[in-house]
Amino acid sequence: INGEWIKSESNELIDVINPATEEVIGQVTAGTKEDIDKAVSAALEAFSTFQQTTKEQRIELLNNIISEYENRYDDFVQIITKEMGAPIWLSEAAQAKTGIKNIHETLDALKDYEFERPEGDYTLIKEPIGVIGMITPWNWPMNQITTKVSAALAAGCTMVLKPSEISPYCAMLLAEVFDKAGVPNGVFNVVNGYGPTVGAALSEHPDVAMMSFTGSTRAGIAVAPVSYTHLTLPTTL
């Protein structure tokens, strides 16, 4: 949160299990509504300046992220193998590779993207929407995370990500990559935890301008109605 690893308001821990061996490979804290409040506050504060960055600055930032991702590529492969129980070859050739591929594709799209263009007698200007809440699943984590996150960065948005509590470590590793790449504090925030607590708190937060969700039907049914109570809150499922 805001560029720092911080102690959660909760003392509850979640075991992260390698499904191939059924061994506990580590633990993460089950976050709280208070943790989400801190993360959204940091993202909202960062948005005031990050939204003003130029396309060229965001292109440079994505290039830096790609470079740092490549430096940690083997770490992504190893952690995905452990938290998903995936074979090494699959983690390397598909899981980790898809993550960096998504960032490359976003970068290519950004280079040619027109945020401002004439439309007849008018000028159409596309502006970043604000703080985006993101919820991602366990089974293809880097694909889902990088698809959402890289697009938000390219648009000039800030974000709070709740990764799956089943496979949270690749998101935490990505946070290290972003920090090393120079992503400004507060632009990318990660809060681990369960959907009914952390996910719900994120989707109903008044300062979240948009929700992007990929996951189970159960979780989608829970998130969508809460988001739609904010009548102007776009929600993509």
Model-derived regions, located:
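A short, hydrophobic C-terminal helix/tail in secreted or cell-surface proteins
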Residues: T232-T236
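Rossmann-like NAD(P) dinucleotide-binding subdomain of oxidoreductase/dehydrogenase enzymes
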Residues: F115-L231
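N-terminal Rossmann-like NAD(P)+-binding subdomain of aldehyde/semialdehyde dehydrogenases
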Residues: I1-G120
